[in-house]
Amino acid sequence: MPEPVKVLVTGAAGQIAYSLLFGIAKGDVFGKDQPLILVLLDITPMMTVLEGVVMELQDCALPLLKEVIATDKEDVAFKDLDVAILVGSMPRREGMERKDLLKANVKIFKSQGAALNKYSKKSVKVIVVGNPANTNCLTALKSAPSIPKENFSCLTRLDHNRAKAQIALKLNVASDDVKNVIIWGNHSSTQYPDASHASVTLQGKDVGAFEAVKNDDWLKGGFITTVQQRGAAVIKARKLSSAMSAAKAICDHVRDIWFGTPEGQFVSMGVISDGNSYGVPEDLMYSFPLTIKNKTWKIVEGLCINDFSREKMDITAKELQDEKETAFEFLSSE
């Protein structure tokens, strides 16, 4: 058996983690023969709840799970990690300005970035889920200068999966038959879900999404707004934010980092924008279409960007620049 992979999940007493931990522990992410050490971090008031989560993981009697470490201390949580999945963040409370939310989270992710820098392996893969995910990820990256920038990514796979599902529902096909949708930009309501490079398998043949759907107005209108606002729609209906679908997206995201993307397919992830060929400003965590091989991602090059797409891509880049400026003001005053 290979050496255990050491994986941290933060916000481990929360509802996303509750759906996520079982998937990781039973081998859905790192493979069915890869032993694991799970490290669960949460804030001190959540430690009793976390004990219950540990009991349940023990009671699952999972053969791959070699050890579970529950802690409220960063020096314990970040020690010698292979993978860090940063789910925990300050949630937006009613009446809270986005600026206040950014300020609270800059503090958290600055501290966690510094802990990654100090205690984790330099090869650690860091996945940020806690919102605002892109800017939280950039904050952690800036606070961990000894870890390569390329090791940081943030979750836009939930948006990617939502986009696939919407096209599949529209055409009454399996979501696996929809390939190469793209989420550009921020994991927020300015994101740009782009179907212009997507294909759909119909009767064994791959057809462009626009040709398959035969409804350009929907693909340039209702499809985009549905994906952009899906998180809010789930909260309105369920009175809680997406957890099961978020956990599934995290599993997809990390599994693709670990094992690579299938030939001819790309996925969406927020990564550092340095050196991109799509006119996105440098030094942002921006969601691009990527292929992954040997645990290394590459932005898909050469996709044609029409005026409609350009405008949408610029709007979300502008929001990310504004967020970054606000976050960095707080960072420098910390």
UniProtKB/Swiss-Prot annotation:
Subcellular location: Cytoplasm, Cytosol
An example Gene Ontology CC term for this record: cytosol
UniProt entry tagged with the keyword Transmembrane helix: no
Record InterPro entries: L-lactate/malate_DH (IPR001557), Lactate/malate_DH_C (IPR022383), Lactate/malate_DH_N (IPR001236), Lactate_DH/Glyco_Ohase_4_C (IPR015955), Malate_DH_AS (IPR001252), Malate_DH_NAD-dep_euk (IPR011274), Malate_DH_type2 (IPR010945), NAD(P)-bd_dom_sf (IPR036291)
Predominant place of localization: cytoplasm
Amino-acid positions noted as binding substrate in the UniProt annotation, renumbered to this chain: 92, 98, 131, 162
Keyword NAD: yes
GO molecular function: L-malate dehydrogenase (NAD+) activity
Reactions listed under catalytic activity: (S)-malate + NAD(+) = oxaloacetate + NADH + H(+); (S)-2-hydroxyglutarate + NAD(+) = 2-oxoglutarate + NADH + H(+)
Name of the top EC class for this enzyme: oxidoreductase
Keywords: Cytoplasm, NAD, Oxidoreductase, Tricarboxylic acid cycle
Gene3D superfamilies assigned: Lactate dehydrogenase/glycoside hydrolase, family 4, C-terminal (3.90.110.10), NAD(P)-binding Rossmann-like Domain (3.40.50.720)
An annotated GO BP: oxaloacetate metabolic process
Binding-site list for NAD(+): 11-17, 105, 112, 129-131
EC number(s) on file: 1.1.1.37
Active-site residue list: 187 (proton acceptor)
Protein family according to the UniProt entry: Belongs to the LDH/MDH superfamily. MDH type 2 family.
Complexes and interactors: Homodimer.
Biological role stated in the UniProt entry: Catalyzes the reduction of aromatic alpha-keto acids in the presence of NADH. Plays essential roles in the malate-aspartate shuttle and the tricarboxylic acid cycle, important in mitochondrial NADH supply for oxidative phosphorylation. Catalyzes the reduction of 2-oxoglutarate to 2-hydroxyglutarate, leading to elevated reactive oxygen species (ROS).
Protein name, entry field: Malate dehydrogenase, cytoplasmic
